[in-house]
Amino acid sequence: MTIHIPAACEGRLLRSYLKLTLGLSTAVLAKLKNHERGILVNGERVTVRYVLHEGDILEIQDRDTPETATEHVIPCELPLSVLYEDDHIIALNKPPHMPTHPSHGHLCDTLANALAYRYAAADEPFVFRPLGRLDRNTSGVVVAGKTRAASGCLGRSLKQGLVTKRYVAILVGEMTADGTLHSLEAPIYHPSTGGIKRAVGDPETNGAVYAKTLYRVLATGNGHTLVLCQPVTGRTHQLRVHFSHLGYPILGDDIYGKASPRMDRHALHALSLSLPMPFARMREDVAEYASPLVGLNPDLPLNLPTPDGYLHTWAPLPTDMEQAVADLFPQEARLALAPTVTTLKALDVSEA
């Protein structure tokens, strides 16, 4: 990555610029400092105590090399739907039934395997650095950093609460379609009985941790409810646990509800993910990122960076959920899931 230092950064310490402006983590910075050509200014290796000047050319060796790409993922040719890609990140639409990471029994059928094949074909070193993960049977948006620096930047944005994930789910049972933005706060814990199942609990008695979900009912019909939802926190199985706790389990969820002949998986899809683009602008002014949808042109295309340095991804529904929505709900429900900024605003607190 090459950056031309602007006049506004005259006199700043390089360390400050790397950490606050570019958002590099301490771990990423340490690796760059140990690399012979990790950080160069005007072609010369410098320390992070270097004082920047207008017109300096900063070069950061943040690309993986065969030596640094130590992760071994078997390249496997699998279907791969790319929503957006640049030098720093890639956004993908993960299909249902595909694990995110390799594991025992899933060594060559995962999203990581598909990406490894893509980059092996281009003769590029590969390390899989996803921003979070989706359950095998959950479809939708997965974003990954293509470099250590970009991944560190994404991780910082996530910790600062600047990343917004939106899901669409089909629930069993009919909620009240009142158009209200609902907020559910119910702590979640992992019972000691083993297995992967989580439950709503009490922080005092079983160590349950805080969990919050926002949701809005889009449509009801034929004994089911279509909801748009946002996990404000990121607990394991959070949406599945919360809706089951309300008495409206996700359709096809054989852990928190029951299996369904209509779908052979739980009807949950990661529809959209909004995040600040790595290195797009000054990172220290976090307040500017607080409400990225406010004032945004409703006709602005998704899956492209916005003028203010955000990316709002959008993953179309897979065939099984698209068919279920068509079978269960009126046509207006499909209009409520149109790929527009207006749809994204349905879960924005500032719009409630």
Residue ranges with predicted function:
Residues 1-352:
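RNA pseudouridine synthases
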